């Protein structure tokens, strides 16, 4: 047997040994990840729901028709401006990606 064969055999056995050691990890660590993610999603969702409820209650308490009209007007103007700027940005990105022809 040559030294290359022994070296290759040693490396294969070393890799297999590490694979066997990795297989003995408890399964709880893998399942802990999704549970943590689920808890974070639930807490963020509850915070978002409470913030929406607080904003809705505040809006209902301070409802004024003139303010509501101004808010709707500002919303429509800002969405029109944002759609225009989004179109410009999209055109710029596409022209950069295409390059000069």
From Swiss-Prot:
Name of the protein described by the UniProt record: Apolipoprotein C-II
Reported function: Component of chylomicrons, very low-density lipoproteins (VLDL), low-density lipoproteins (LDL), and high-density lipoproteins (HDL) in plasma. Plays an important role in lipoprotein metabolism as an activator of lipoprotein lipase. Both proapolipoprotein C-II and apolipoprotein C-II can activate lipoprotein lipase.
Subcellular location: Secreted
Keywords: Chylomicron, Glycoprotein, HDL, LDL, Lipid degradation, Lipid metabolism, Lipid transport, Secreted, Sialic acid, Signal, Transport, VLDL
GO molecular function, one term: phospholipase binding
Modification comment: Proapolipoprotein C-II is synthesized as a sialic acid containing glycoprotein which is subsequently desialylated prior to its proteolytic processing.
Pfam family, one: Apo-CII
GO cellular component, as recorded: chylomicron; high-density lipoprotein particle; low-density lipoprotein particle; very-low-density lipoprotein particle
Signal peptide: 1-22
Native species: Plecturocebus moloch
